[in-house]
Regions:
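Phosphate-coordination loops involved in phosphoryl transfer and adenosine-cofactor binding
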Residues: 32-38, 166-169, 268
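Rossmann-like adenosine-cofactor binding region
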Residues: 215-274
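Short glycine-rich anion-binding loops that position phosphate/pyrophosphate groups of nucleotides
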Residues: 111-113, 176-178, 239-243
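Phosphate/diphosphate ligand-binding glycine-rich loop within oxidoreductases
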Residues: 31-39, 47-158
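Positively charged, low-complexity intrinsically disordered leader regions
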Residues: 1-51, 55
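Glycine-rich phosphate/diphosphate-binding loop of Rossmann-like nucleotide-binding domains
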Residues: 43-65, 158-238
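A short helix->loop->beta-strand "cap" motif at the edges of active sites that frequently abuts
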Residues: 133-135, 197-199, 264-272
Length: 274
């Protein structure tokens, strides 16, 4: 089984319940990964995802190997049929097969370039390893998804949701940022919320900052941030760059910054952020 999207799992509620049990006794399954190796390949930097994934593997008794392709390893070519006479030193076909020989699971982190939308949404790096690797692939944040983060968010909401409400209200709110940021975290949060049958979900952002319509299909969109925050139990705040004017910062309105006054509109809501 590959884990590329939160929708790859068979039951979100079952996975969340299992994760909460594991948190209470993280070394309970320390022999599960005996004689198995996790290979972690980083095409972009990481702090929390790297540490938490590596720690989880060690808790399961796995060996862990890490490669940072920013300053280690060869530059890879991902286009099939490409003539290897330019900057790339090795083709993904051979690289994925080699890594598969030494690893039982391959975890990959490769961000969006935020220049070519079509290329990013084709998930060039992840797709290349999926095609040629012979072992399971885990997504540690790709061009358009971050399913480990969204699973962790689902766990947090289960732990802190109000028990007196049948359907807690969750808001995903855009907020300004000086840099152009990927849509991966927001996309995966939306996909996770689409699996939550017992929660109300609203996305709020400035007009023109819609996420991919394929991702947000059937979601409630509210362009009035204050209205969206009313009676919310969770407010998840994240910036993402423009999807239509791809990768651009077309709005930096400070009025979209989340403040204590805005949180006062919520139902004593929990503030979440990645």
């Amino acid at each position: 089984m590959n884990y590329i999207s939160i929708k790859d799992i068979d039951s979100l509620s079952k996975w969340v319940k299992s994760a909460i049990k594991i948190k209470k006794d993280p070394l309970k399954n320390k022999k599960l990964g005996k004689n198995k190796t996790l290979g972690m390949l980083f095409f972009n930097p990481s702090l929390r995802t790297r540490l938490s994934t590596q720690k989880a593997a060690l808790n399961l008794g796995m060996n862990v190997m890490v490669m940072n392709f920013t300053n280690e390893g060869w530059t890879l070519e991902f286009e099939d049929g490409a003539v290897m006479n330019s900057g790339a030193s090795e083709h993904i076909k051979e690289a994925a097969e080699v890594v598969s020989q030494y690893c039982d699971i391959i975890a990959i982190r490769a961000f969006a370039g935020l220049v070519d939308k079509e290329k990013d949404y084709q998930e060039t790096v992840i797709s290349g390893f999926l095609k040629y690797a012979t072992v399971p692939i885990v997504n540690m944040e790709s061009a358009i998804r971050h399913p480990l983060q969204s699973l962790a968010d689902a766990i947090t909401m289960e732990e802190f949701k109000p028990r007196h409400k049948d359907k807690p209200k969750v808001v995903l709110s855009w907020a300004p940022h000086p840099k152009a940021l990927p849509q991966a975290v927001a996309n995966s949060f939306v996909e996770m919320m689409q699996l939550q049958k017992d929660m109300d979900f609203v996305i709020t952002h400035p007009e023109g900052y819609e996420l991919s319509p394929e991702i947000t299909k059937d979601c409630t969109i509210e362009y009035d941030q204050n209205k969206a925050f009313e009676n919310a139990d969770f407010v998840y705040v994240k910036n993402w760059s423009n999807f239509n004017d791809y990768g651009k910062v077309t709005n930096s309105d400070p009025n979209w910054t989340v403040t204590a006054e805005k949180m006062a509109l919520t139902n004593n809501g929990k503030f979440m952020h990645c």
